Swiss-Prot record:
One of its GO terms (molecular function) is structural constituent of ribosome. One of its GO terms (biological process) is translation. GO terms for cellular component: ribonucleoprotein complex; ribosome. Keywords: Ribonucleoprotein, Ribosomal protein. PANTHER family: 60S RIBOSOMAL PROTEIN L34. InterPro entries: Ribosomal_eL34 (IPR008195), Ribosomal_eL34_C_sf (IPR038562), Ribosomal_L34e_arc-type (IPR047868). This is Large ribosomal subunit protein eL34. Belongs to the eukaryotic ribosomal protein eL34 family. It comes from the Archaea.
Length: 88
């Protein structure tokens, strides 16, 4: 019986082959879901998905696109937003 904290499905079950030839069950936290646009819900490109300790190892320029609203709005929604701002 696994420890209580591993019985939840928030942990992914991974079978590892050890050097001794045994298959051992390991528990791994699942990857977070992909980032989506705040307006239309479309998947965002250029935004890595991973656990915080993996993302923290990346350079700032690799964490999200270097444009206004990068990592928050998709490119088409950002374009619409800029047009509306200019028209006001």
């Amino acid at each position: 019986m696994p420890a209580n904290r591993y019985r939840s499905r928030s942990y992914k079950r991974v079978y590892k082959n050890t050097p001794g030839g045994e298959n051992v069950l390991r528990y791994k936290k699942k990857k977070p879901s992909k980032h989506v646009c705040a307006e239309c819900g479309k998947l965002l490109h250029g935004v890595p998905r991973g656990r915080p300790y993996e993302i923290n190892k990346l350079a700032k320029s690799h964490k999200r696109p270097n444009r206004p609203y990068g990592g928050y709005l998709c490119s088409s929604c950002a374009r619409k937003h800029f047009k509306n701002e200019a028209r006001k």
